[in-house]
Amino acid sequence: MPVISIIVPVYNVEKYIHQCIDSILLQTFTDFEVLLVDDGASDHSGSICDEYAHRDSRIRVFHQENAGVSVARNKGLCEAIGEYVTFVDSDDWIKPDYLNELYKCLLERNRGKGLILGSFEWVYPTRILPVSVEDMLLYHADFYRLITEFICGRMMYVWGKLFNRELIISKKIAFIPDVSCFEDMLFVLDYCCYADYILIKSNYNYCYRVSYSTDTLSSRINSYECELSICREFLLRLKLYQDYYAIADAEMQNAWRTITVLFHKVILAIYCHKNQYSYSKRIRYLRELTLNNRNEIKRMFLPAYLADKIAKYLLLYCSNVCFDIWMRFLYKINFRRMFGHKTN
């Protein structure tokens, strides 16, 4: 049985997948398996993965219909047999000592059921930006800092970390299938509910490729019901941590700012062109939203532009009809900037 399982969700990355897999095979720590999960790629990514599997017995490939990164990672977790698990995105790559450094940190803690994480580098087309973190050891009593400090930083991604697979299995921790925004943050928060410690090391062995997408925010929005469910999943976890660690509301500001985009997507889901909800359904959704989530709206609806400020005022202090008229007007004139994002 390998010590470490490396899970790589793969989707339309034929341009980068060679560099990703090659970097894994060049690891100085060699007791690992690689699980490449082809999430219905329409390019040659899947066949490239198969070629690597034929050449190296440590590689296993799984092909599935396109279901999203969360489902692909869950497939990897179901098939993994290693004692520990790490995730690598298929357009990123790792330096030769990535696994070795993480595992050495684990041995320092006599293994245990913790979370090991290192730092990383943002890789832009024209420059590389190392992300500096200080060496740190947190025990369970200190995990409130996940919410008060780290949630708004760069430490909540699922990659660049080493997880205990037994803990994941025993606590039935998994990625939520419909979540494609901050899905890794949910997983990390769930895992840390049961972890004994978090060990942070300032080694730059993970290289994160920063890509510039031409997608608009609306093109990445699901149905209203789906977006609301995702937002509630985050609110549930924030409330859990806040209650358990008795975190004051004033210390939750970083958390609210971080998940603002989720609430923005809930609102935009009502109005984005692909959903085409009727007037009566839009008003019903707005009524349900304001009736049951008024305090959360005040915290999460953080205006970035004048149009947003007007929208927030109408939603909270005027009628739902007024808000609906305003939002429909903005979409009718093809207004391009709402909630700090490009929407059309």
PLM regions: where:
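Catalytic core of nucleotide-sugar-dependent glycosyltransferases
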Residues: 203-212, 218-248, 262-294
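Short loop->beta transition adjacent to catalytic acidic/histidine clusters or analogous donor-positioning motifs
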Residues: 2-4, 25-36, 44, 56-60
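Donor-binding/catalytic cores of nucleotide-activated saccharide
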Residues: 69, 90-225, 244-246
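N-proximal low-complexity "stem/linker" segments adjacent to membrane-targeting elements
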Residues: 1-25
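Glycine-rich, basic loop-to-helix element that forms the pyrophosphate-binding segment
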Residues: 64-80
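Short aromatic/hydrophobic "clamp" motif used to bind/position activated sugar donors
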Residues: 85
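Membrane-interface aromatic/basic loop that binds lipid-linked glycans or pyrophosphate carriers
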Residues: 271-344
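A conserved acidic beta->alpha catalytic loop
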Residues: 23, 38-48, 89
